[in-house]
Structure formats: structure tokens, C-alpha cells
Amino acid sequence: MSLGKDRYSLPRSYKRVSHAKEKARPELRKFGWDTLGYAESFNPPPLKDTIPRVDGKKISVDEFRRDFERPRIPVILTGLTDDWNAHEKWTLERLSKKYRNQNFKCGEDDHGNSVRMKMKYYHDYMLNNRDDSPLYIFDSSFAERRKTKKLSEDYKVPKFFEDDLFHYADHKKRPPHRWFVMGPARSGTAIHIDPLGTSAWNSLLLGYKRWVLIPPNAPRDLVKPMAHEKGKHPDEGITWFQTVYKRVRSPAWPKEYAPIECRQGPGETMFVPSGWWHVVINEGLTVAVTHNYCSVENLHLVWPKTVRGRPKLSKHWHRKLAESRPEVLKIINSCTDTPPQSLNDSSSDSSSSSSSSDDSSDSETEEDSGRCGLGNRKRRNDVCTSECPEKISNSMV
């Protein structure tokens, strides 16, 4: 039975939440948000935590690049958030008080427009919902809005990810790259690969996230739910855990696509290398921050995808890199995907290369062999970002 207005603590919560739900997922109007009873029945099997963990204070940037970023090996880094103000400021109590009247993105409508809710109503919903796949705050514009930009001062980008080559592009032209993330149990992200060949990092401040990562070469049809399994929640993490996860854990799962599983806890930072499939579900109330980035180690993957998917951005970015980081041009020049005349023409790059004001983002649904020196390319589709709900980011880690 759907949550009634008497279950919320604020008098307007029911109306505000119902309005957001109607805009974000109108297809559930008749079916209902809690019909499957996952709040009571969802119980994944015991975790097999197989990810390496490394003390982030005891490894250098060069060692990280050599051991994890270059070979594209997922890892959890510990200790990187120890001195963040977010540890004290990102509690549910403080967030719901300081930002109570600020709107945060918790979905998208059928036209790609942001669905937003005031923090005070989302907090009420977060604590009291029984939904099968709850609304999830995934907000990429928090650092640009005057009344929420303080959130960006509560954390700092870890040293391993500071050299983001997209920083050299004008801010309004680069794709969305950072998200404030907040959600209850059963919220999460469907299986996806991060956009434009980027890698991602995700630092968790509150709660626990369950991750499954699958190697880049795994076929899309193998890692995605089958058509008959999608039901009313086709693009939700909980659907994946109720369907594909059972196959992933079975002895019949191909050994060449062996998954990495883990439970990320408070203060831990997940590194997701370029191309890895990953799916996330929150085990309880969670608060996190996540960024997508391009470095010298994954530029050979990012550049061909950017040329193909965001050609005007690629021309602008190339000019900026030539001015500020000319040493990386040899990586770009080695990419056979780069059209020889595309970087020197005089066409404008001010329109389609600009990122949307609605937190949208480009992405792929499958491993795209868009690395330097490789010619075969698969079709791009829309999916999502580093740890991002497909319903929320359907255009863009």
C-alpha cells in the first residue's frame, strides 16, 4: 500500500513528494511505487568482498597510476576524506537544516527536464518511504547555485584525481562532472559504463553502498536484464540485483567476466576505471560525492569518444589543451579516430558543446572500443554517469 500523508512529519511532504513522483515516473501512476514490496522482501545474498583496498595516505600518485589507473583496476582508497569538513557537515540533521529550503534534483521528466524537491521534503521522504526503487538525489549543479555551492567547499578532490584534463575546457562547455548524491535504502544506479571513456571516483560520507563491477569486455546483452525481466523498473539498480545478479553469482557465469564486488563504507573512496560496467545499490541512508574525470592515463579512451560524441567540444578542448598542456597532444595525435581537418576548421563550438542546464550528460551503454589505434566502433546510446541513475541522467561519470 502506498505511503499516506499521515506517515510524513511535514504537512506538505505528501503533496510535494507525489508531485515529484508524477513528473519523474508517470508510468507508475497506476502500478504504484511500492507494489512489489521490496522494502520487506529485498535481501541480496551475503557479500563476497573482492576489491583491493589501499591506504590513500600511503600510496603516491605515480604508484596509483602504475598499479590501478593505467591497468584499469578498480580499487577502494581509504583515508582520503579524513580531513574533509563534510564528515561533520553532511549529516542528515545538518543537511536537512542548512539546506531545507533549497531544491535538489531527484529525477527527470519525460522531456529531460530536472525534477527537483526541497531538501526538507526529500529528507522527510527519505526517512519514511517504502518504495521499491525510491527517488534519488543526484545533483550536478549544486556547486553553481548560490545557496548550495558551500557544499563544494566541504570536500576536496583527492590528489590522485586532481589532474583532470577537462578542467582546461571552459566550464560551460565541459560535460557535467560532479554530483552531490543522497538517497535511502534500495535507491541506486542501473548497470552502466561511464560516459565518454571517463573514469570516476566516489567518496561516501554516510551509510553503505553495495557495488558490483564487471570487466569492460563483457557483452552488453550479458550484463543487462533480459527484456522479460525488466518489469516496471527497467532502468533501476534494484531490478538488476533481483535478476542479473543471480546469474553473476552462479558457477555458470563466464570466468573471463568475473565480477568485483564490495561494500563501500563511510570514508572510503571508490575508483572506477574507464570502461568498467558497474551497478550500485544503497543499503541504507547514504550521502556521497562523485566526480568523472579525464587524465593522461585515460585520454586515449576519452578523446576518440569526445570527437565522435561531442565534436564541437572536442575542437574547443583541443585548442585549450594545445595552449596549456601541449605535451598531451602526442596522445591525441596517436588516436586514429581524430578526423584530420576537424580540429582546425573555423566553425563555432558555442552551441551543442555547451552542457545542459538540467544536469544532463552524454553516455554509453556498452563498452566502446574507442581507444587510440583501434578502428572498430560500436554505436553510442544514452545511459548515465559515474554512479548515476539512468532515469536521471539520460543524455550526458
Swiss-Prot record:
One of its GO terms (biological process) is phagocytosis. Its main location: nucleus. Keywords: Chromatin regulator, Dioxygenase, Iron, Metal-binding, Nucleus, Oxidoreductase, Transcription, Transcription regulation. The keyword Transcription regulation applies. Substrate binds at residues 189, 209. Residues 146-310 form the JmjC domain. Belongs to the JMJD6 family. This is Bifunctional arginine demethylase and lysyl-hydroxylase psr-1. It comes from Caenorhabditis briggsae.
